[in-house]
Amino acid sequence: MKLLWLCNSAPGVIRSHISGKPMSGVNWVDHVLSGLRRQGFTIRVLYRGTGEPGIIDETCSYAAISETPEHIYVPELEEKFREEIRAFQPDVIHSWGVEYHHALAMVNAAEAEGKLSHMVASIQGLCRFLAEHYTDGIPGNVCRKSTLRDFLRKDNILQQQEKFLLRGQLETKALEKLHHVIGRTNWDHGCALSIHPEIAYHFCNETLRESFYEGHWDYQNCKKHSVFASSCAYPIKGFHYLLEAFARVVEAYPDATLAVTGSSFMPTDFKGKLRQSSYEKYLETLAKKYRLEEKLVFLGHLSAEKMKQAYLDANVFVLSSTLENSPNSLGEAMLLGVPSVAADVGGVRDLMKGPSEGFIYKSGDVTALAEQIIHLFAMEEEASRLGEAARNHAQITHDPEQNLRELMKIYEEIR
């Protein structure tokens, strides 16, 4: 079977082929790609990025599409995609996500080439709904402010929200036309049907990064009273809520620390201050208000292996997002058996059953979040029981072989 994939970024195997360097870890899309190639599928991958077209072997070829702002539709892409469809003659077209403008361009191209009934899109994030929760818990005056960086980029919090709304409009147009969609939670199922009641919804869980299928959290080896969050990059991750909750955690556990990936949002150098966004400025204000500056650990950009170690080092993993579908970060924490606390948003309850596998709290309730972190700290070794139950569940949800079988079944149904 011939598959035409549309990806938001280049899979690792393609980056490796272009650079001539070995792959540094296997990400989730590579996991799926390699499985399909082993099963005899021929796959052409189109991805956002740069580089010349290439051929890895008889099972896989690739080409880049230009990176333009996600929220601005590029009509010229339609003709490029039509040419790809005519040249490759795929049995199935698969767009990994509908949250970028190129997904709509592929939908329109498939329709023009008579291939729309043989196209499917996987739901990843849904910008239309993310936009509704983008500013949750952030004061209005903070949302309206602009740092120099925001002013130059036209990218303060409200402007970021507007871009999500625009992406949501393109996403909605794509879903309204599509005949088939792949999802994995009750939440994305409801969202898809609310946009297009007649769409055929296919269930398929996600496979995660390969390295997270090995390793096991151990209370004796973790950093006691430490919390790990996977991102503070933008408001939807809800790190402002976590800072407020963590201030209460520190009252009970003065030695507590909070680690997060990425660079510090509290720059000390002049250039860093010039690059600071209004959301980062707000996080800095909260950190200083609650005197948390010395409690925060910024881990920078992490490889998959280093990210895994950050989970294993933590006493507790926290997902404080204002909205998620099926967050990979929570899935990775569960696969490793890390005791976790998660906001009750989107499809979280499809991933983790509370309280037997971890604790779930109402999004925005910083008191409940703090209490649940404190509770897990106090459980000490006993928290391993929750982590083990979560691990068992995640091994079923993220079973690579089962998920590959489900995906191949979907492809057979719509070819």
Regions found by a protein language model. Give the residues of each.
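Aromatic "clamp/platform" in nucleotide-sugar-dependent glycosyltransferases that forms part
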Residues: T322
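Short hydrophobic beta-strand element within catalytic cores of glycosyltransferases
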Residues: P339-A342
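Membrane-proximal helix-turn-helix segments that form the acceptor-binding/catalytic region
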Residues: H31, C127, C143-H180, G190, ...
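Short alpha-helical donor nucleotide-sugar binding micro-motif in glycosyltransferases
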Residues: I85, Q309-A314
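Nucleotide-activated donor-binding/catalytic signature segment of Leloir-type glycosyltransferases, i.e.
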Residues: G272-H301
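Conserved acidic donor-binding segment of nucleotide-sugar-dependent glycosyltransferases
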Residues: G354-P355, F359-V366, H375-E380
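N-terminal subdomain of nucleotide-sugar transferases
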Residues: M1-E52, C60, G114
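Conserved donor-binding/catalytic core segment of Leloir-type glycosyltransferases
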Residues: L4, D218-K237, L243-R248, L258-T261
